[in-house]
Amino acid sequence: MESTIDVLKNRRSVKSFKDNQISKEDLESILSAAKNAPSGMNLQSPKILVIQRKKIIERLSQWNKSFYPKEIVDSLPDDFDPFYNAPTLLIILVDKNVNTCVEDGSLVIGNILNAASSLGIGSCWIHRAREEFDSLQGKELLKVWGLSEDYIGVGHVVLGYPNDEFTFNKKEIKEDYVVYVDDLI
């Protein structure tokens, strides 16, 4: 297992997955890391939805794609899958009544991405969850799933074993990413 610092420095988004499902043990380890993410005042506003049924993931993927801007959809191949055919999909929702809800959900996603990487599992943060769950269809899904309409989407995470041919790009870090401040007005 890589050191924590190495995982944080080397993790990359994976967008090509093998068909086989991740193990229950690995999924539980990832979810444990997610549940232990910091949250404002320890209010723990996030909910993590776990979807592993291929047909449900396919339907949610098409729904997600419907929120892309038209000019992007027009530039994509017809068979483009925003969830990259991953066998596991996590949806991170948060209670909008908690002041730090988006930050809390983002920390959960960060823990998921890094825990997955430490286990050799590929992951990618997929956007448009907010748009999905702000919509009427999203509100209906929340009801179906037994959740309050107070939940909003922060993001999706796809998980799976990376395809053998998938290559990780070297991450270029901006030179001005960190600014040291040593004076005040």
Say what each PLM segment does.
Residues M1-I185:
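Acidic, surface-exposed loops and disordered segments
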